[in-house]
Amino acid sequence: MSRAVRTLALGGLVLVGLSACVSVPRGQGSGAAVADHVSDSARQAEAARQAWLQAHPNWSFQGRVAISKDRNGGSGRIDWQQDGPRYRVQLSAPVTRQSWVLTGDTTSGAGRLEGLDGGPRSGPDAEQVLLEATGWTIPVNQMPDWVRALRIADAGAARVDLDAAGRPRTAQQDGWTIEFLAWTPAGADQPELPQRIEARNGEAKVRLLVDQWTVSP
């Protein structure tokens, strides 16, 4: 990776304290502790939530993200749009007005990154494209399920711990440890969805705070 590309990618996102970036506002649903026992009614409610989400594959969210690996890191706004297996993710730094757009398909795993100095980059592995361009490790093909806490156990997670409501609280998958720290309350048109998520894999960390969820009918 060229030094110029690394400088652009890391310099464009405002470097700030990660915890400050993803602090949960007051009044938002908070996460619960891992439960020793989950009632049958809670398991049924979670199964219904999962079924509803699988029946609604088109969705989007806006929020804030903080990414770090070793001593490199940055934070900014994130706008994720999902249309079945296809996604479009825009990362932007309001202060510098720079932005990057990653598009891809979770079925094929391929991706394309735009907004880099020197033009777009694309390849058969979106995660590798992002790693080579920015130095960041982000499991983009797992993220659509992770951000909704959907099919975690079915996706090959080595371990899943639940809270008393039957929702995933922590999970381990493909070397990553994912924590679901806060949830948005259910509304008239959608079930509970994660609000704050932290994922770690060695020195790689991703912290996400969702400000708004939209699920298409």
From Swiss-Prot:
Its main location: membrane. Residues 1-20 form the signal peptide. GO terms for biological process: lipoprotein localization to outer membrane; protein transport. A lipid is attached at C21 (N-palmitoyl cysteine). It is found in: Cell outer membrane. GO terms for cellular component: cell outer membrane. A lipid is attached at C21 (S-diacylglycerol cysteine). Gene3D superfamilies: Lipoprotein localisation LolA/LolB/LppX. It is a lipid-anchor. The keyword Lipoprotein applies. Keywords: Cell outer membrane, Chaperone, Lipoprotein, Membrane, Palmitate, Protein transport, Signal, Transport. NCBIfam families: lolB. Belongs to the LolB family. Plays a critical role in the incorporation of lipoproteins in the outer membrane after they are released by the LolA protein. Monomer. This is Outer-membrane lipoprotein LolB. The lineage of its organism: Bacteria, Pseudomonadati, Pseudomonadota, Gammaproteobacteria, Lysobacterales.
